């Protein structure tokens, strides 16, 4: 998983009715003498407020933005839509499907987190890890999830990261320009944190049965712990308990305590 920092960016001497910061806009930083690139993972547009052009609460991710395209061919029984980089951060993955070479219409597909409420029109994708530690994207069969057609073009965009190496990065400089403007003031609101290695086999062996048992339902304390670990990958450890177990009982509530793997806050 890629480290993420939160910054405010003030555009000095800007003009116009709005300013667009493109997805993939780069920023540079140094940690322990080593340089790293951070970037945005979405397009952001602002309009001036009282003549001030300011991007607030911008999330920056360490790594490089990568794009792969596949053309669907049902005659190829071995075709797979692979994320080819083992250091890819799948939480940054964006999956879009173009109708065909001659039809540039794009549809965005979202990660399916369960099977409930899915039908043959649901534009979702699924993720599974392959034997070599890389990930494969696959789609519905026309019953659960929309089925792709021959000629569709699958576009995978994601960030390849150095994992935890850039945790703690606190000072950033603009690597290029934002909407043609390069005179900026960057204020760091949250140092880079959350960068981590891939989940170990031992952790998967422990957590997988708990996630299967919970079935995306939060009933027992163990269910809550499992779901919270899924929602917050930067959580090193999670403990959940019912309010009735407190020294001063509080009924009808569940309390959760989380220890972050890095930094002092949890990324959303």
Which residue stretches match the model-derived regions?
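Signature of Asx- and small-polar-rich beta-strand/turn repeats characteristic
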Residues: 1-268
């Amino acid at each position: 998983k890629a480290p993420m920092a939160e910054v405010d960016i003030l555009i000095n001497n800007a003009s116009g009715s709005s300013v667009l910061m493109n997805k993939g806009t780069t920023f540079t930083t140094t940690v322990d003498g080593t340089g790293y690139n951070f970037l945005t993972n979405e397009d952001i547009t602002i309009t001036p407020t009282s003549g001030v052009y300011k991007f607030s609460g911008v999330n920056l991710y360490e790594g490089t933005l990568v794009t792969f395209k596949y053309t669907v061919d049902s005659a190829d029984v071995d075709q797979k839509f692979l994320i080819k980089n083992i250091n890819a951060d799948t939480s940054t993955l964006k999956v879009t499907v173009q109708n065909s070479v001659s039809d540039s219409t794009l549809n965005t597909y979202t990660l399916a987190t369960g099977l409930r409420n899915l039908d043959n029109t649901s534009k979702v994708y699924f993720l599974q890890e392959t034997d070599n530690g890389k990930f494969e994207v696959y789609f519905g069969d026309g019953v659960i999830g929309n089925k792709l057609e021959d000629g569709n073009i699958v576009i995978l965009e994601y960030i390849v990261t150095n994992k935890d190496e850039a945790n703690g990065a606190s000072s950033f400089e603009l690597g290029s320009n934002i909407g043609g403007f390069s005179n900026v003031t960057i204020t760091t609101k949250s140092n880079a944190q959350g960068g981590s290695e891939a989940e170990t086999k031992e952790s998967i062996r422990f957590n997988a049965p708990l996630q299967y048992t919970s079935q995306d339902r939060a009933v027992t304390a163990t269910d809550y712990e499992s779901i919270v670990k899924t929602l917050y990958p930067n959580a090193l450890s999670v403990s959940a308990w019912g309010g009735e177990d407190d020294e001063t009982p509080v009924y009808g509530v569940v309390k959760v305590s989380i220890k972050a793997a890095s930094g002092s806050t949890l990324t959303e």
